[in-house]
Design a protein with these regions (language model features):
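N-terminal glycine-rich, Lys/His-bearing helix-loop that initiates the first secondary-structure elements
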Residues: 1-60
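PLP-dependent enzyme catalytic core of the Aspartate aminotransferase-like
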Residues: 2, 12, 85, 126-127, ...
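Conserved PLP-enzyme active-site core in the AAT-like
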Residues: 2, 6-10, 15-27, 87-306
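Positively charged, small/polar-rich N-terminal and surface patches that mediate targeting and assembly
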Residues: 9-15, 21, 69, 364-365, ...
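Short loop segments at secondary-structure junctions
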Residues: 41, 229-233, 341-345
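Conserved N-terminal alpha-helix of the aminotransferase class I/II PLP-enzyme fold
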Residues: 41, 46-98, 120-127
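Short amphipathic alpha-helical segments
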Residues: 59, 85, 223, 274, ...
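Conserved C-terminal alpha-helix-loop-beta "cap" of PLP-dependent enzymes
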Residues: 304, 310-396, 400
Length: 421
């Protein structure tokens, strides 16, 4: 049976692997789903036993801030989906990005990042400047730009696989090759792609981050983040001095420092209930993403026929990153599209006229969500920085849900038509 299961895990498709993989074999009392360990601490029969857990001589849990069975089950599930060597859950996607960068960088170090990042991530990178960690932004992450930007202080290349909301697609193979030639790891936020569309570690990335609050959870009922370490990067401990103390762990030095030092001391733990809710949510990821991507494609093509609407979606034939849909994203365009309405006033009018789109700041929900990003998500960013991220005063971002696509199309086309009056 063990050999049969191993063969199945290599040969089966996404949804089967998701439901019947290594992490779905049952738990302590043979539960189908991991139970919720909603506790602060764990008890032991003797002080010696607890000491062995604290000194990592025995497996076990002591305090939920540093480990919890419900959270571990979710970590293992996502780690398996991404093909990683280890994963750490965090309280949010922003917490995951923060912990990852602080585990690699220290004062005086540099990060190279794409400009098309989520507004909150840009704000974080500016905050890290106050700690002496400098970010060099580049309009396009590719081999040519990296060659001219990498210095002896560069410690990590960071970007989104599909940027939100500008929909710039990173060529992971090209960027990872350029990074590795310089002895630098590639850290990717793959929230908008999800493991359904792409597995960045297989493409060459070293570390993958998700805001699990989005597509992985899928129901908009919990906040969380996760960091997956591919365990393949050969760290130069003379260059990456933040990891020098963890040299004995070799290629897993990042993961060990992350879990036992930065993550633990920042208090970045995921709540057990949130882990449980996201574990349930991720099991329908394939079904949801198939429907979401189909809806987004249909809605984008319908809106693209409107003469006074400028639509941005990856499957549109003229899109500059259209080629990556098949080569890197499994034939899918994802769940986000955006369009320019011509003015801020018209953008607001369209948003306010929609019947089946909820005005909210999340993405990846079952419901279609809509927002004016310039006045919300990029409120703290300057105009130049906001426009570099592909966000303009007339931009409307749409996170497409699983509604019937005919209803969505009719709703958006009606709102666009009404906005002309």
């Amino acid at each position: 049976m063990g050999q049969d299961r191993e063969a199945m895990e290599h040969d089966c498709k996404f949804n089967t692997r998701l439901l019947h993989g290594e992490t779905s074999k049952g738990y302590g009392q043979r539960e189908i789903l991991p139970p919720i360990s909603q506790v602060s601490a764990f008890q032991y029969e003797s002080m010696e036993e607890l000491e062995r857990v604290f000194t990592h001589k025995s497996m076990g849990y002591a305090y939920t801030r540093i480990g919890n069975p419900s959270v571990s089950a979710f970590e293992q599930k996502i780690n398996e989906l991404e093909g990683g060597a280890g994963a750490v859950c965090c309280s949010s996607g922003m917490s995951a990005i923060t912990a990852s960068l602080l585990a690699i960088c220290e004062s005086g170090d540099e990060i190279i990042a794409g400009t098309g990042l989520y507004g909150g991530t840009i704000d974080l990178l500016h905050d890290l400047e106050k700690l002496g960690i400098h970010t060099i932004f580049t309009k396009k992450l590719d081999k040519t730009s990296l060659t001219g930007l990498i210095t002896d202080r560069t410690r990590v290349i960071f970007g989104e696989l599909i940027s939100n909301p500008s929909l710039i697609v990173m060529d992971v193979k090209e960027v990872s090759e350029a990074a590795h030639e310089a002895g630098i790891p590639l850290l990717i936020d793959s929230t908008t792609a999800t493991p359904y569309m792409a597995r960045p570690i297989e493409l060459g990335a070293d570390i993958v981050i998700h805001s699990t609050s989005k597509y992985i959870n899928g129901g908009g009922n919990s906040i969380g983040g996760i960091i997956v370490d591919g365990g393949k990067f050969s760290w130069n401990f003379e260059k990456h001095t933040a990891l020098k103390e963890f040299k004995k762990y070799g290629r897993m030095a990042f993961s060990v420092r992350l879990r036992t030092d930065i993550w633990e001391n920042l208090g970045s733990c995921m709540a057990p209930m949130n882990a449980y809710l996201s574990y349930i949510g991720v099991e329908t990821l394939g079904l949801r993403m198939e429907k979401i991507c189909d809806n987004a494609d249909a809605l984008a093509k319908a809106l693209d026929k409107e003469p006074d609407i400028e639509v941005n979606y990856l499957t549109l034939p003229g899109h500059p990153y259209h080629g990556y849909v098949d080569s890197q994203l499994g034939g899918h365009g994802g769940g986000i599209l955006n369009f320019r309405a011509g003015s801020r006033e018209r953008a607001f009018k369209i948003i306010n006229s929609l019947k089946y789109a909820v005005i909210a700041s999340n993405i990846g929900d079952l419901r279609t969500l809509v927002i004016h990003p310039a006045s919300t998500l990029y409120l703290r960013s300057g105009r130049e920085e906001t426009e570099a991220a592909g966000v303009f005063d007339d931009t409307v971002r749409v996170s497409v849900g699983i509604e019937d696509k005919e209803d969505l199309i009719n709703d958006f086309l009606s709102a666009v038509a009404d906005s002309r009056i």
